């Protein structure tokens, strides 16, 4: 609650599962309580669907419910992905662990969508969308010689 009391905005991640809808309802009420009592500027900037498996009816139903009740839901959804699950165990973000994975691409899309929303509110100047970073490697000869 302290983080919400100090924040200007919150992004709520929601797993595409039934009980997550219940949790989203509770968290929305908590945000509203904090807005009334502690932080009138607190805003839900968006809801992010995560662990989304488009092959299941449940995920699609949860998505429909979330989008119906929370119009600020991000277009981007984060898919359920083995590579996303593996990355933390290797101590790396997905954009380093497997930059070409669907999860990495989804997070890059989310970053671009956030930038777009900030631009629409004139909070940042117009910028180019994120592009995958080039991998820079130091040739072995430079590593050995400390160049």
Regions found by a protein language model. Name each.
Residues 41, 121-125:
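Short, polar/charged, Gly/Pro-enriched helix-capping and turn/loop motifs at alpha-helix termini
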Residues 58-60, 87-90:
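Short aromatic-enriched loop/helix-cap "lid" or pocket-rim segments at secondary-structure transitions
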Residues 88-109:
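C-terminal boundary of histidine-terminating zinc-finger modules
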Residues 109-121:
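C-terminal alpha-helix
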Residues 1-82:
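Conserved catalytic-core segment of NTP-binding enzymes
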Residues 25, 29, 105-112:
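Short, contiguous clusters of charged residues that form electrostatic/catalytic patches at enzyme active sites
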Residues 124-144:
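Long, low-complexity intrinsically disordered regions
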